[in-house]
Amino acid sequence: PETRTFDRPMQVEGYAPANVGYLGGDLKGVLDNAQYIADMGFTAIWTTPIVDNPDEAFTGSRYPGRGPGGDKGKTGYHGYWGVNFFEVDEHLESEGLTFADFTRRLRDEHGLKYVLDVVCNHGSPAWTMPEDQPMFGELYDADGALVADHGNLHPGALDDDNPLHAYFNREPGLAELADLNEDNPDVLEYFVAAYSQWLEQGVAAFRIDTIAFMQHAYWKRFSDRIRAQRPGLFMFAEHFSYEATAIAEHTWPENGAISVLDFPGREAMNSVFADGTSYSELESYLHLESGLYQNPYELMTFYDNHDMDRMDADTNGFIDANNWLFTSRGIPVVYYGSEIG
């Protein structure tokens, strides 16, 4: 059928062929290769979100065709289109391996911690569908009850008197995603409850997606509530900006004391190790004594990840990049595959 989730090739002019469906990756696959990761000296694994996503490919889009700017024809294989944040997506668990089993075996058999990818800003694509599709724009609770439904409506058409619309903002956010209202206390309660139960199943740290799309006050409340249950829990976030002054605010205690992925560092490393600029560029992002970050040594450092092109360096450039990554300040994060250059 048109909306099957497996093996959906996508061809966009000017881009390499891609596939937007599920291709079989699951928790068992990660566990089967965990020792390979541990043998390289890594101590933790971060995957994209594990929560339940819609079962079909999205049929709507404000954008023409299937270009990089639109989600038409794509599935939630990546995990960022959550509809039930209390449930594991059915593509990930397998017979004899629940998520709790997975984190326990990572820890006990391979010495690896698991980092959970946290999304509070949005749910799944929620509007522009020719006909409303199951699960899209919906949220379910721990009992499987429907608590929010966008109804395939433009955000501006949502009804203030409809309790199923109360979770959503009235202005569009990212693409056609259901944009969640951080000013609604029920949204905070939903996510605190959801992510607390994943801590009970062996999660060791949080990586927070799209942190800049929600107010600092929300993240302060969220982090306080979560750390009341797990004191000292390490959290780091994605604020996709190359301006240190922008991303540093998240690390301050009054904003939740959440570390960040070091995008300014990524920019400097690509400039030096891929483009061949002066090594002096590397000093600009460290901020060891500027006081900009609450603790610069807790920043997550990287030279590429799943949201961007891989670093295009030659062999010596990759060797130098990894030498720098693993010996300079911060906590190194390596995107799978980059370990071989």
Language-model features: locations:
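Substrate-binding/active-site clefts of carbohydrate-active enzymes
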Residues: 1-201, 221-229, 234-239, 245-246, ...
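Active-site-proximal helices and loops of the catalytic beta/alpha 8
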Residues: 103-104, 108-111, 131, 193-200, ...
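Active-site glycine-centered loops adjacent to acidic/histidine catalytic or metal-binding residues
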Residues: 117, 337-339
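Active-site neighborhood of divalent metal-dependent phosphoester/pyrophosphate hydrolases
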Residues: 120, 303-310
